[in-house]
Structure formats: C-alpha cells, structure tokens
A protein has these predicted regions:
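C-terminal motif of bacterial Sec signal peptides marking the signal peptidase cleavage site
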Residues: 16-19
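Beta-strand/beta-sandwich contexts
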Residues: 21-67, 114-153, 185, 194-215
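Extracellular carbohydrate-recognition regions
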Residues: 198-240
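Extra-cytoplasmic beta-strand recognition segments
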Residues: 213-215, 282-313, 379, 428
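Short carbohydrate-recognition loop motifs
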Residues: 231-277
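Extracellular beta-strand ligand-recognition surfaces/modules
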Residues: 297-298, 314-319, 356, 374-422
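Beta-strand acidic-aromatic groove motif in beta-rich domains, primarily in extracellular
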Residues: 306-331
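Extracellular carbohydrate recognition and processing domains
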Residues: 332-395
Length: 434
C-alpha cells in the first residue's frame, strides 16, 4: 500500500511538472515541419534591415516557420543555433567567424528532413590589413604587388596625391596595382566593403635613410673595403651598392671574402678625442629608441644570370664599443672608449660577437634572384639575434648599438652551391614596421 501511494505521488508530481511547463512556457521551442522563409534580416539590437553583415556579428532573421530550421549555413560555414533565440518568426544568430572556402553570398537553411531553403545575404570579411609592397621605391607607371590580409575585391587603393584606383581582382592576400602618375611619398590606403586600412610602410619612404649612395649627407663606404658604388641601366634611381661580380666565386660554405662581399660603415674620424664630423654615427640619421618596432629595409636586385646560392647576408649592427673607424681605445667626444677599426666583432675572435640578422632567401629553393627587377627587403630589428654561424647571440641590444652597419655575405651556418652572385643594394633605411 505504501509503495502504491509513493508511485501515485511520483505520477502526480510528473503531471504537475508537465502542466507547469505548458502553462509557464507557452512559447517553448518546438521543431516544426516544412520549410522556412525569410522576409528580411536586421541587426539584433535595432530594427534596421540589412543585406550584409560582418563575421561574428549578431543578426536577426525575420520570417515564417523559422522553427523548422535544423541547420543553418552562411556560405559554407555552419552557424551555431540556440533554440532559446528561435521563434516561429525570428531567429537570432551570430555570423560564423571563419572565412568560407566558397563565397556564394547565401544563407542555407535545412529542415530536419534535409530539405533546403536559401536567402541572398553577404558575409563581409574583417577589415583589411596592409602589410607590404613588393617595391616601395617603384616609379609611377610600374606595377607592384600589395600584400596583407582580407584584401578582397572590389576594393580601391589610394596613393598620396592621387585619386583611388579600383581593383577588381584579388585573392584576399595580395593584389597588383599600377602606380598612378603624380603619386607622392607617403602611406597608402586600401578600402574594401569591410573597412579602410592604412599602411605602416610609406611609398618612397625616406625616413631614417642611412645610405642612398647618391647625396650628402648620407655616408657610404667607411671601413677597410671600398665596395663598388655605381649606376647602370638597371639602377633604381642614381647609384647603388654592388657586392660580388660575375667573375668572383662564392664557395658552397659562403667562405670569407670580405674584399668582394663586405660593405662596412664604421663611424669615427682619426682624431683624439674621436669626432664624427666626416663619418657620423648612424644614430644621427634615425631614432632607434623604439628599435624593437623597427626594421632595416633596402631595395635589392639580383639578376637571374648571377643568382645567389650560398652564404648568408649578415646584417651586423654594432656600437662604438665594438667598432669605429678611428683608433682603438681612444675616447670620443661623448666620453665613450672606442673600439677602433677591426673585424673581431664580426667573427667574435677576441671580442664579443656583434648581433646580426641572417638574410638567406636562397635556402628555400637552393637559388635566389629577384627576377631582373628591384624588390624591397624588410628585416625586423627583432631578428638581429644571431651569431655568424646561426647560433643565438647574447649581446644586449640598446639604441646605441646601431651606430654602425656591416653587410657581409659570409657563412651563416648554411651550406649551398658555389656561385657567382651579383647583389645590388639601394636605399638602406631604418623605419617603423609595426
């Protein structure tokens, strides 16, 4: 009898719960049959109709029989449905955050039976980002490649002093544009349906110019070797620095050949105390206080007839404590004891090895040239962390570390193929890159 009473109590409790559910939640979600229809789409937080939305934006579908929706896709990306936000006439949903593999500009709605209804709606990618330009010192009329992310056409690109140029084709990571006549130095602007982006880099950037090999007061050779500074029919503008020669071989180990492959700028005159009148500190030309957010940039031309196949381009920075152009152990006008001219800071023989970046683009394919055209090379100063053999350098970099620059194609901890590279360099500069 007690057991029967207990069972009746449980049954009554269940009936009461069911009744409460029916009474208290009359709009509780129930999957329906048939196909949905959408009348329009609006923002979730305001009654404004829209035909497109950004990724991860919350929107509201308005229509009929929306409770029949079992699966929902924007293009080919599935949306996460929450039945708490679905009624017969409205459905609140967040646009998927991933880029579609195929952009169809449609919403796909499947019911439980797998039947399909569609609605035209465009998902916008995130706002564009511009990160690079294949040749920052290109002339008007030349075609360059702009790189970045979310660079989806249709878009426009604007150079200072010119009207925007329409771009109709882009895969999202890069596009090509012909620089318009009248383009002035400065940052470029890219506009897509998702927003506007301005480059950190500048077209024809002359900020922080260390060497242009043309005009004073920018210095040139100031070390043990006077490398070739010349011009020819390939010149970007005026003179350039040349390392290597068709008749000079760089062996497979990138063996030491400073006579042909080392450019040195070591500041300091032969005075006591050492002055910098004729050979200034490179910190006179660029502010390195934010060096972690800066990069060394230059234009590079390597002809296809003389590709580069061995050795690393060692981009070496050093303060006056490691190298200067004057005498050793002599005070300078700022009270520093100068190191004098030497190559020990390069090899680490008898002195701390100076920090450097190792530019080795040939290692990915075994050979590198620039396709008989100039390109811009960007090497962040945060990558100046190596020794000559590719091991990690422990020298503490400070803003005053950047008073000199040595470019030496040598070693780098890689083995390649003997070659006769011709390496042309112009417009070496220290600029912000992020």
């Amino acid at each position: 009898m007690k057991a029967m009473t207990r069972n009746i109590s449980i049954l009554l409790s269940l009936l009461l719960v069911a009744a409460c559910t029916t009474w208290d939640y009359p709009d509780r979600f129930k999957q329906t049959e048939g196909l949905p229809t959408i009348d329009y789409v609006r923002y979730a937080d305001r009654d404004v109709a829209i035909t497109q939305a950004a990724m991860e934006e919350v929107i509201c579908l308005v229509g009929e029989n929306l409770t029949s929706i079992h699966d929902l896709y924007f293009n080919d990306q599935a949306a996460v449905l929450n039945t708490s936000f679905i009624t017969e006439h409205t459905l609140v949903v967040s646009v998927p955050k991933n880029l579609p593999l195929e952009q169809t500009d449609k919403i796909y709605m499947y019911n439980k039976a797998g039947d399909l209804a569609t609605y035209d709606f465009k998902v916008l990618p995130p706002a564009p980002k511009v990160t690079g330009m294949s040749l920052e010192w290109a002339q008007p009329g030349e075609t360059v490649t702009i790189t970045g992310s979310y660079l989806f056409a249709p878009l426009t690109v604007e150079f200072p002093g010119c009207d925007p140029v329409a771009i109709s084709s882009s895969d999202g990571s890069f596009f090509e544009v012909t620089i318009p006549e009248g383009a002035q130095p400065g940052k470029i602007k890219v506009t897509t349906e998702s927003g506007v982006a301005q480059s950190v880099f500048m077209y024809k950037d002359s900020r922080g110019m260390l060497f242009n090999f043309d005009t004073d007061p920018h210095p040139a050779n100031h070390g043990w070797h006077a490398q070739v500074i010349e011009t020819d029919e390939t010149a970007l503008s005026g003179n350039f620095l040349r390392l290597g020669d068709p008749g000079v071989t760089l062996d497979e180990e990138g063996g030491w050949n400073d006579a042909n492959f080392s450019f040195e700028y070591w500041p300091g005159d032969w005075d006591e105390p050492v002055t910098y009148t004729d050979s200034p500190l490179l910190t006179s030309y660029a502010d390195f206080s934010e060096w972690k957010n800066m990069a060394l940039k230059f234009e590079l031309f390597i002809p296809s007839s003389n590709p580069w196949k061995s050795g690393a381009m060692q981009l070496i920075v050093a303060g006056v404590d490691l190298v200067t152009g004057g005498g050793a152990d002599v005070p300078d006008i700022y009270g520093n004891i100068t190191a004098g001219a030497n190559n020990m800071f390069i090899s680490g023989s008898g002195k701390p090895m100076a920090p450097r970046a190792l530019f080795r683009p040939w290692t990915s394919t075994g050979s590198y040239d620039t396709g008989d055209k100039w390109v811009t090379v960007t090497v962040p100063y945060s990558e100046f962390i190596y020794n000559s053999d590719g091991t990690v350098n422990t020298y503490e970099i400070k803003p005053e570390t950047f008073t000199s620059l040595t470019i030496f194609v040598w070693s780098g901890g890689v083995t390649g193929t003997a070659c006769n590279p011709v390496i042309k360099i112009d417009n070496i500069r220290a600029v912000p890159y992020k």
